[in-house]
Amino acid sequence: MAKTDLHLTRNIGIMAHIDAGKTTTSERILFYTGLTHKIGEVHDGAATMDWMEQEQERGITITSAATTTRWKYAGDTYKINLIDTPGHVDFTAEVERSLRILDGAVAAYCAVGGVEPQSETVWRQADKYNVPRIAYVNKMDRSGADFFEVVRQMKAVLGANPCPIVVPIGAEETFKGLVDLIKMKAIYWHDETMGADYTVEEIPADLVDEANEWRDKMLEKVAEFDDALMEKYFDDPSTITEEEVLRALRNATVQMAVVPMLCGSSFKNKGVQTLLDYVCAFLPSPLDTENVIGTNPNTGAEEDRKPSDDEKTSALAFKIATDPYVGRLTFFRVYSGKIEAGSYIYNSRSGKKERVSRLFQMHSNKQNPVEVIGAGDIGAGVGFKDIHTGDTLCDETAPIVLESMDFPEPVIGIAVEPKTQKDMDKLSNGLAKLAEEDPTFTVKTDEQTGQTVISGMGELHLDIIIDRLKREFKVECNQGKPQVNYKEAITKTVDLREVYKKQSGGRGKFADIIVKIGPVDEDFKEGGLQFIDEVKGGNIPKEFIPSVQKGFTSAMKNGVLAGYPLDSMKVTLIDGSFHPVDSDQLSFEICAIQAYKNACAKAGPVLMEPIMKLEVVTPEENMGDVIGDLNKRRGQVEGMESSRSGARIVKAMVPLAEMFGYVTALRTITSGRATSSMVYSHHAQVSNSIAKAVLEEVKGRADLL
């Protein structure tokens, strides 16, 4: 394939709530850009982008498939790398990874549902990574569709600056096409060619006034970003050319100052080509984004790399997937330099050189082999032995570490065991591979029971993992009931002297420390251990201080109540003493671990549980039952709003421990008419009576409460 100029490359993702039609829109993009000859429908389970079996069965997208496609716009052929991202909240990690490596995004909304809870989460994630966006309001053919209401919600809920650049012609079942406010023409799609052909006509007479009004608002908004346009706008708006509007809108979009708004109905094949045109027109190319910044692992100095093939290589591995035919595929984005098939590349985390045996550009899950992937491009490689999500790949002569990604900690765990003992190895091998692919999924062995416990972001997340074990690794599992990932905390400050002595002939062990242990300071935000060394006059030699710190850090993994990790703690090392012969680093480490156990038991230990932020959309008549049920689940209702389809939105904070099987219960209460979505919010202290019950169940020490 011919090499595309970098300014004609677009690395984009489609981000949205579940069911806003992300995958259907991606399918249409592939159809119109000529990559698929038959359109895949999500509800038939045949969508090209949803290539895992579970996705096709459940009709949701779990892994971000990356696809490369081309589109002609304004005389040039653009190369579009399209990343389809999941909208289900349990798979937030996938979204976070995709946004890290994109240059721009299309935020898709449902014309009926508008800005939904997950849309808000994803919007904030895109803000965090400075990803410019255009918005696409889908499902304009559905009853209750209202384009301008979604524009209003984007402003109110997301605090965005939406700028409609189209006006729909008709709505609901009469939705026929769009008025393009930049060209001031009407576009109608032909149903007989599945929307592949369309006609451009004059604006219908009954829409001329509305179109002029919205065009005027659009010009007023973009004039702020272009001085020449501003003058024309005040002198004579009719002299403003299409090129000037496009240039001003592009600048404003790339600076994240406005969000151009389009609409359509992907399922009914209307509006997708206009969306593709404006993806090319407004979203940034790799050259429009800032140079990527990383640190040199040898010197710690900051370095930046330009998006050019002549620079030293730097690339970020953003996803690892196991493919049945080629084995482990590593998806990466090349920021500078290039990666060639058959060459060696250095992994700055592991410090090892790896050979990239083959390179591919992906079309959903089919691979097209390529020889080289250059700066600004996205591709996948085979042949890496030791690689994790977030690793930087670079030249050995010019190592660099790009900023990696932070992922939330898992909140729910279940114990699993294979149905037959002989599958034990298969199970651990399968779990290890899945944990490599997904940073929000962890596997550990419970020290007390010896069970294997897998943890993830929610029930659906773990269901899919168990399902994949069965399909991909042929392991059938028995699973325990879900467990909540509790934490522990201390509430009081305690002073303590701990002496550790061991004399068993020959050299003994000796350490003596005086510490103050308590909750962290309010301004200490990062969690973990806040360690302060106040030892004067060398009473404890400098080389033993890190061992004391290490002892406390490792001890915090097991709380005194039931062995749950302690989230944060402040330790002030005040004084102590040592023995010139018997003291060593290990003595001080063990002494710190003992001090931790003794002090925490007296420091008012409490149990902390994960609290979830819940939103339920329910019909008015079921509202009382839904709230009554939440009260039974120890929920705190924080607010209620009306949605425009006559339903009510209930927002509440509810402990995760009370939420198992909630989806089924909600279905029963509302006869299947309500929907809910849940995101982890924070950990909060559990009341004494509930803490006692939890501790008795896990055989913890309820006597310390």
Curated annotation (Swiss-Prot):
Superkingdom field: Bacteria
PROSITE patterns: G_TR_1 (PS00301), G_TR_2 (PS51722)
GO cellular component, one term: cytoplasm
One Pfam family per UniProt: EFG_IV
Biological-process GO terms, alphabetical: ribosome disassembly
Keywords attached to this entry: Cytoplasm, Elongation factor, GTP-binding, Nucleotide-binding, Protein biosynthesis
UniProt xrefs under InterPro entries: EFG_II, EFG_III, EFG_III/V, EFG_IV, EFG_V, EFG_V-like, EFTu-like_2, G_TR_CS
Residue span(s) of domain tr-type G: 7-287
Residues annotated to bind GTP: 16-23, 84-88, 138-141
Subcellular locations according to the entry: Cytoplasm
CDD domains from the UniProt entry: EF-G, EFG_III, EFG_mtEFG1_IV, EFG_mtEFG_C, EFG_mtEFG_II
Gene Ontology molecular-function annotations: GTP binding; GTPase activity; translation elongation factor activity
Record-linked NCBIfam families: EF-G, PRK12740.1-5, small_GTP
Record function comment: Catalyzes the GTP-dependent ribosomal translocation step during translation elongation. During this step, the ribosome changes from the pre-translocational (PRE) to the post-translocational (POST) state as the newly formed A-site-bound peptidyl-tRNA and P-site-bound deacylated tRNA move to the P and E sites, respectively. Catalyzes the coordinated movement of the two tRNA molecules, the mRNA and conformational changes in the ribosome.
HAMAP family: EF_G_EF_2_B
Similarity comment text for this entry: Belongs to the TRAFAC class translation factor GTPase superfamily. Classic translation factor GTPase family. EF-G/EF-2 subfamily.
Protein name: Elongation factor G
Species annotation: Bacteroides thetaiotaomicron (strain ATCC 29148 / DSM 2079 / JCM 5827 / CCUG 10774 / NCTC 10582 / VPI-5482 / E50)
